[in-house]
Amino acid sequence: MKKTLSLLLAAAMTLSLLAGCGSKNNNDASQSAAGSGSASASQSQQGVEKTGVNFMALSGPTGVGAAYLMKYYSAETSPADCPVALNSTVVADNKEVTDALVNGTADIAAVATNVAANLAAKTDGGIQVLAVNTLGVLYILEKGDSVQSMADLAGKTVYATGQGANPEYVLNYLLTQNGVDPSQVDIQWMTAQEVTAQMVSGDSAICMLPVPAATALMMKDQGVRQALSLSDEWDKLGQGSLAMGCVVGRTQFIEEHPETVDAFLDLYGDSITFMSDEHGVAGAAALVGELGITANEQIAAKALPQCNLTFITGADMKATLEEYYQVLFQADPASIGGSMPYDAFYYGAE
């Protein structure tokens, strides 16, 4: 029954997304008749002329929401009446994505929110944020029951992943706000695989991991428990949403292909809806596993309900990110590139 429901939902979403492309392209055709020079606005007998979009996504929660889009809107699978044709790549390191954006081999990418701000500062406005796609996904995991609060981490060793990105700054901020100097905690930065190895081999180990790495660890070792949700700890402080993942684009690409970017965002929002639907977990998990966004489909199925997918654009996106960036800036200006991003950083927020 669940499999049937997932297939029906996938079919419904496909029809919805195809209809969205048709609607977008009708507008584009009118703009073309008025003299628009955008490649995505040119109509032909076979359908609209497509604009190729080089899209990169981080493995893990930041990339999960795009799985449907990546699968069904590639250069090979994009419908004839849709102006978007994705060439997608999934990578594990923020640096791979930022390097690709800087050198122009990626046009649009899903990255950590603090990385987006740093990159905008580094490129002097060469990057804009298009949407927030992921909220809080960080957890403190433990073998044992000694950690009941952030304060309990004082004097402990914590294996963690995410140095130089949101996880490091969020952890340090939450420790400080709970009366613990981060220097009182032995935070050992590692890859997710190394953290998992330490947790499996240790008797009373503690770690910080994001979903789905946290999910995979708990599936591998039944003795590991979820001690704290850092989203819950953040919410206790009343500092707005813990906005951890976003979609960014190269400013040059955005200015040259505005209709394509808007069509991409329409499709991305629909993809988020599909990937976060609780009745379609099996189908969504299959896509995530197939594309290598998680290690396998089984982990994806367990992790999806905790991936905290969202889709926030325009003025709401700006308000959400500015509140989050203000917290990071006060804690460590270098975490977002030394200054608050300019208004032009926020696409469609005017």
Which role fits each region the language model picked out?
Residues 73-84, 155, 232-240, 309-317:
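Short, solvent-exposed loop/beta-turn-alpha elements that line the ligand-binding surface or hinge
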Residues 43-180, 187-189, 205, 211, ...:
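Short, glycine-/small- and polar/acidic-enriched structural segments
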Residues 132-143, 225-253, 303-306, 343-350:
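Periplasmic-binding protein-like
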Residues 322-350:
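Conserved C-terminal helix/tail region of periplasmic/extracytoplasmic solute-binding proteins
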Residues 113-115, 123, 188, 194-287:
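Pocket-lining segment of extracytoplasmic ligand-binding domains
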Residues 18-39:
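Bacterial lipoprotein signal-peptidase II cleavage site
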